[in-house]
Amino acid sequence: MELLFCGHDYKYAVEQLMLLMFPEERPEYVEADGGAPSFAEVRLSPEGDFSETLLRLGGKSARGEARLDGAPPSDPLLYKRETQKLVKLSFFRAARELTGVTPPWGALTGIRPGKLAGRFMRQTGLGRDAAAEFIEREYYVSPRRAALCAAAADEAEKLRKSLDKNDISLYIGIPFCPTRCAYCSFVSHSVEKSLKLIAPYLDALQRETAAAGRLAAELGLRVVSDYIGGGTPTT
């Protein structure tokens, strides 16, 4: 699918949704509409408060839009979050109109959808039911998945509140997998292509883990959990 961006460069965000809604398509970035049968123009207004997507595929066309309530945030990080959300929603709405398909997770594509529900509960003071309704309404998530998302976020928030200020979690990234999945968004490599890197990586990992332990002890921090990941469960 040819992708034309106007006013932004959120390639990864749009690619995720394109692969979700049109799994047979592959992205090709263009500077103008050349009349290709598979094409999407995704626009973001100069003010950052409105996005529009014009989509064409299989002889059909569709349009989707998303508008921000109020002015965009002045904080750069929040501005990127909100404008990227607009871009994704406008593309999703156009794709949904064209295909008639709404995936169970709606317009959500990341690996931690519970973060959205958790942020909503912290900002509003409302509970998991309200969070589920928000996720369902805002991102087109199915009622069952929205309830699961809110429940997970609620439990995570309870655990977060139970932690002491000096409690930390240690993440150990494993950048190798038996194979690399087509949909993978992690910085990982297949074992077949990176076999020679595994031994030096493990050596460096041992030294870094020991150093992290010493630093935690010096700072009076307590490691309450280790997370080892970065690849698929088959790693």
Where are the regions a protein language model picked out?
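Canonical Radical SAM [4Fe-4S] cluster-binding loop centered on the CxxxCxxC motif
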Residues: 167-200
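Conserved, mostly hydrophobic/aromatic
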Residues: 177, 205, 228
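Short, conserved phosphate-binding/catalytic loop or strand-edge motifs used
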Residues: 109-115, 152-154
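A short, structured N-terminal alpha-helical element that caps or precedes a catalytic domain
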Residues: 1-107, 118-119
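N-terminal [4Fe-4S]-dependent radical SAM core
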Residues: 99-102, 122-170, 219-220
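A general alpha-helix detector
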Residues: 94, 112-120, 130-134
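Canonical radical SAM enzyme core domain
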Residues: 190-212, 234-235
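Conserved glycine-rich "GG(E/T)P / GGGxP" loop and the immediately following alpha-helix
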Residues: 216-235
